[in-house]
């Protein structure tokens, strides 16, 4: 899906994000495009299943993983019409910095963004939401 890489380039262009991915979640979940060598390129079908699944309470207690990176859920509106967003924060290991993550949903895809250190979650959310809105208008 080489055409999807242009969307990743667009999301990464302003330098506020360190990782981005577009993941297809219908039928057989898979990463359509992602930043090479980063976390989101390794997202598994099981991780996608947790994101889009009906159980919306367990990850508030246990967190969830994206590409093996543990995350805490801050706000879950992923399945709410008009919202379609989930805000997360990476969990720290050994005092490492944590980062804001937003996941947005379209009819066929999940758009994931991870901000750089110190980048406000609201900025990441807005950028991710705008890309998802564009994809929804394009019937994705």
UniProtKB/Swiss-Prot annotation:
Molecular function in Gene Ontology: actin binding; actin monomer binding; adenyl-nucleotide exchange factor activity; phosphatidylinositol-4,5-bisphosphate binding; phosphotyrosine residue binding; proline-rich region binding; signaling receptor binding; small GTPase binding
PROSITE patterns: PROFILIN
Residue(s) carrying Phosphotyrosine: 129
Modification type N6-acetyllysine: residues: 108
Main location: cytoplasm
Sites of Phosphoserine modification: 28, 57, 138
Record location of the Glycyl lysine isopeptide (Lys-Gly) (interchain with G-Cter in SUMO2) cross-link: 54
Domain of life per record: Eukaryota
Keyword tags: Acetylation, Actin-binding, Cytoplasm, Cytoskeleton, Isopeptide bond, Phosphoprotein, Ubl conjugation
Gene Ontology biological process terms in this record: actin polymerization or depolymerization; cellular response to growth factor stimulus; modification of postsynaptic actin cytoskeleton; modulation of chemical synaptic transmission; negative regulation of actin filament bundle assembly; negative regulation of actin filament polymerization; negative regulation of stress fiber assembly; neural tube closure
InterPro entries (UniProt xref): PFN (IPR048278), PFN_euk (IPR005455), PFN_sf (IPR036140), Profilin1/2/3_vertebrate (IPR005454), Profilin_CS (IPR027310)
Assigned GO CC terms: cell cortex; cytoplasm; cytoskeleton; glutamatergic synapse; nucleus; parallel fiber to Purkinje cell synapse; postsynapse; presynapse
Placement of covalent cross-link Glycyl lysine isopeptide (Lys-Gly) (interchain with G-Cter in ubiquitin): 54
Post-translational modification: Phosphorylation at Ser-138 reduces its affinity for G-actin and blocks its interaction with HTT, reducing its ability to inhibit androgen receptor (AR) and HTT aggregation.
Subcellular compartments: Cytoplasm, Cytoskeleton
UniProt modified residues of type N-acetylalanine: 2
Assembly and oligomerization: Found in a complex with XPO6, Ran, ACTB and PFN1. Interacts with ACTB. Interacts with VASP. Interacts with HTT. Interacts with SH3BGRL. Occurs in many kinds of cells as a complex with monomeric actin in a 1:1 ratio. Interacts with ACTMAP.
Functional summary from the UniProt entry: Binds to actin and affects the structure of the cytoskeleton. At high concentrations, profilin prevents the polymerization of actin, whereas it enhances it at low concentrations. By binding to PIP2, it inhibits the formation of IP3 and DG. Inhibits androgen receptor (AR) and HTT aggregation and binding of G-actin is essential for its inhibition of AR.
Family the UniProt entry places it in: Belongs to the profilin family.
Listed name of the protein: Profilin-1
Species of the source: Rattus norvegicus
């Amino acid at each position: 899906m080489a055409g999807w890489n242009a969307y990743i380039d667009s999301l990464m262009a302003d330098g506020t994000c360190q990782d981005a991915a577009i993941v297809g979640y219908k039928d057989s979940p898979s990463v359509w495009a992602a930043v090479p060598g980063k976390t989101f390129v390794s997202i598994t079908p099981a991780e996608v299943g947790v994101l889009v699944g009906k159980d919306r309470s367990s990850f508030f207690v246990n967190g969830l993983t994206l590409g093996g990176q543990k995350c805490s859920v801050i706000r879950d509106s992923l399945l709410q019409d008009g919202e379609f967003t989930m805000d997360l924060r990476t969990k720290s290991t050994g005092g490492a910095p944590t980062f804001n993550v937003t996941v947005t949903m379209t009819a066929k895809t999940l758009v994931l963004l991870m901000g750089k250190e110190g980048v406000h979650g609201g900025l990441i959310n807005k950028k991710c939401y705008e890309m998802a809105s564009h994809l929804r208008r394009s019937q994705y």
